[in-house]
Amino acid sequence: MRFFTEIKPLKTYVAEQKREGKIIGFVPTMGYLHDGHLSLVRKAKLQADVVIVSIFVNPLQFGPNEDFAKYPRDLERDLALLQEEGVDCVFAPSAEEMYKEGFSTFVEVNGEITEVMCGKSRPGHFKGVATVVTKLFNIVTPDLAFFGQKDAQQLFIIEKLVRDLNLNVEIVSVPTRREEDGLAMSSRNTYLNPEERKAATILYRALKRGEELVLAGERNPERLKKLIEEFIKTEPLARIDYVEVRSVPDLKAMDVIKGKFIIALAVYIGSTRLIDNFILEVD
């Protein structure tokens, strides 16, 4: 497994692989890998000849009072896991390598898609995501890039970015990996104490409840949101950031639930903010 911390030698490596006609699969991560990340890697292994994983906790996508400093990091453990999965190459740059002194160019996807849900709760977050992803795509020049559906809003924004800017990469989305009790796998789950960890299943249970209501015929998005909110409030440790029901993939508000749509949640369990979603379809 090759390991790079600098852009230049990585680009040389990628150019060699391309000369040999190999298909490059890319999995961008912030490290502290769990089975959700590894499911992206496994999918990449199936579809690409060479799999490159990046590990970079991107300072641009964290707000001033967010968890950038305490975001979990363990490069040694991550590298061992990736080696085990048969990854070809890992790129783990420093912030200084990615954002050279005087860096002042940003990529921004505008419109409702970045203004609602996490865009509303975390201003500037998706500007940071779009900028780093564009940089990584330019550095790695992958044929395929793999993203998890757990971060559905991020996934839809990146798909739009690729479409709008004619980037030469195919985005592959991979279903959310869950713990046995339904909790979506996330590096931030490590912040939860045992009591909070138990309480955190409220997100998955609330989504299941929402799905049941839709299957039973509920088509009013406002009423569905209310019922899900009431359900979440039965958990004393939970504090709702948002519950949204929107069309997919443009994340527009709906008057009536039809076609492909998302039920998306952001909920604080203690001081930890967790997100989850179901993507559903009705006639």
Swiss-Prot record:
Q: What chemistry does it catalyse, as a reaction equation?
A: (R)-pantoate + beta-alanine + ATP = (R)-pantothenate + AMP + diphosphate + H(+)
The EC code for this enzyme is 6.3.2.1
Classification of source organism: Bacteria, Bacillati, Bacillota, Clostridia, Thermoanaerobacterales
HAMAP family named among the record's database cross-references: PanC
Q: What's the name of the protein? A: Pantothenate synthetase
Which positions in this protein are listed as binding beta-alanine? 61
Annotated ATP binding sites: 30-37, 148-151, 185-188
Q: Assembly state and interactors?
A: Homodimer.
